[in-house]
Amino acid sequence: MEQFKFNTIEEAIEDIKNGKMVVVVDDEDRENEGDLLMAAEKVTPEAINFMAKYARGLICMPMTEEKLKELDLYQMVINNTDTKETAFTVSIDSVETTTGISAFERALTITKAVEKGAKAKDFQRPGHIFPLRARKGGVLKRAGHTEAAVDLATLAGLTPAGTICEIMNEDGTMARVPDLMKYVKVHNLKIVTIADLIEYRRKTESFIERQGSASLPTKYGEFEIIGYEDKLTGKEHVALVKGDIKNGEPVLIRVHSECLTGDVLGSLRCDCGDQLAQALRQINKEGRGALLYMRQEGRGIGLINKIKAYKLQDNGMDTVDANLALGFPEDLRDYGIGAQILKDLGVEKVRLMTNNPKKVSGISGYGIEIVERVPIEIECNKKNEFYLRTKKERMGHILNFKNIKKYDKSIKEA
C-alpha cells in the first residue's frame, strides 16, 4: 500500500469530529478491505442512505464493552468461530421505529443507542442495526475496523462508538486499495490506514505506569530501580537509574532487551550478558545515566520460541532465518514503550548505547532526541561469531570485528 497516498490520522480525526465519513483500510494480510466510518453520535438518515447506496456492505455499530453491558446486548453466538473474531451482538431496533429498516429509522436506532441514559428497554431484538464489541485497548489490541471506529470517535472527543459499512464495488466484489483511491476521489473523502492509526496512538498516548522504586546496590555500582507496568500487555519493565537525569543535558542510556540465557545463564551464543554488564559499568563510571531492562525476550518472540530458534540454528540456520522459519519477523521489539519510560524519567536528550541503527530510529521516532550513538561492541568468541556476523550482515548492526579479517560463513553458532 506504500505506493498510494493516504491522509493523516489528524485529518481523519478532524473530519470525524465534524460529522464526516472517512474510509479506513486494514492490512492487506488481514481482510484487505475498506470501510466507510463515522462517529455514531453524528449519524444522520442521509449518512445511512449514502452507506447503503455507495458502500453496499452491512451497516454496523462498534461500541465499547461497557456500553453494550448497559444495554444488555449479549454476543450473537457463544462460540465465535469467525477467523477475525468479529464480535457481533444480537441486532437491535429502537422501540420508536416501525420496521426499523429505513435510513431514517436505522439512524434513529444508532443515535438512541449512544444517548446518555439509554437503557435495554429502549430497544427491541432482533433488529436492523448490528452492534459490534470493540476490544479494550482498541487497535493496539485488535487491528480491526471495529476498534478503529471507537478509537477515532474517542480521539475526536466524541462518544466512543462508531458506524461502519464495508465498501463493495458496483459488481459486488470487495473494493481494494486501488478501487478505494478512486472511490475517495469521486466522493471527496479522506482515507487512512489502521496501521497509521496504531502508530499514531503509540506516539501520542502513554501505556506505561510507574509501580514502585527502591535503591539497588549491584556489583557494578549503586542504582535506583524503578518498576513499570505496560498497561496493554501486562509486562513489567524496569529502569536502573544513576544520578540526576532530569536536568536537560544528554543522558547516557542503554535500552536492553531481556535475554535470560545470556544475562542470567551466561550463554556464549550471544553478546547480551556482556553488553548488559558493560552498559552498567559505563553508566556507573559516568555517574549519570539509565539502563532500561525491557521484557522482550528473543527480540520479542519469547523464551520458548527463542529456544526453538536455537535448535534451528544448531541445524545450520542463522538467527534471522530461524525467526522467519518459526513464522516471526526478524525483530518484533517495540521501542515505543521504552521511549515512554524515558519520558516518564524526564529524559529529553539521549546518548544511546547501541550498535543497532533501527533502535536509534525506533526511539527517536517517539520524540526522544538522540544526540549520539555510543558503540557497545563486545569482543566475539568462537561460539557467537556467526551470530554477530549475521547481526552485521543481515540486520545492519554496526560492528567492526577488528580481530577478524573476513566473514567466514562456515562458522556456525554453538
From Swiss-Prot:
In which pathway does this enzyme or protein participate?
A: Cofactor biosynthesis; riboflavin biosynthesis; 2-hydroxy-3-oxobutyl phosphate from D-ribulose 5-phosphate: step 1/1; Cofactor biosynthesis; riboflavin biosynthesis; 5-amino-6-(D-ribitylamino)uracil from GTP: step 1/4
> Where in this protein does the record put region GTP cyclohydrolase II?
204-414
In this protein, the active site sits at: 331, 333
Q: Please give the residue ranges the record annotates as the region DHBP synthase.
A: 1-203
Q: Which domain of life is it from?
A: Bacteria
Give binding positions for Mg(2+) 2. Answer: 31, 145
Recorded hits in InterPro entries, A to Z, give: DHBP_synth_RibB-like_a/b_dom (IPR017945), DHBP_synthase_RibB (IPR000422), GTP_cyclohydro_II (IPR032677), RibA (IPR000926), RibA-like_sf (IPR036144), Riboflavin_synth_RibBA (IPR016299)
Per UniProt, the keywords (alphabetical) are: GTP-binding, Hydrolase, Lyase, Magnesium, Manganese, Metal-binding, Multifunctional enzyme, Nucleotide-binding, Riboflavin biosynthesis, Zinc
Q: Which GO terms describe its molecular function?
A: 3,4-dihydroxy-2-butanone-4-phosphate synthase activity; GTP binding; GTP cyclohydrolase II activity; magnesium ion binding; manganese ion binding; zinc ion binding
**E.C. number, please?**
4.1.99.12, 3.5.4.25
The record's comment on cofactor binding reads: Binds 2 divalent metal cations per subunit. Magnesium or manganese.
Entry's family note: In the N-terminal section; belongs to the DHBP synthase family.
HAMAP family listed in its UniProt record: RibA, RibB, RibBA
Q: What is this protein called?
A: Riboflavin biosynthesis protein RibBA
Q: Which organism is it from?
A: Clostridium novyi (strain NT)
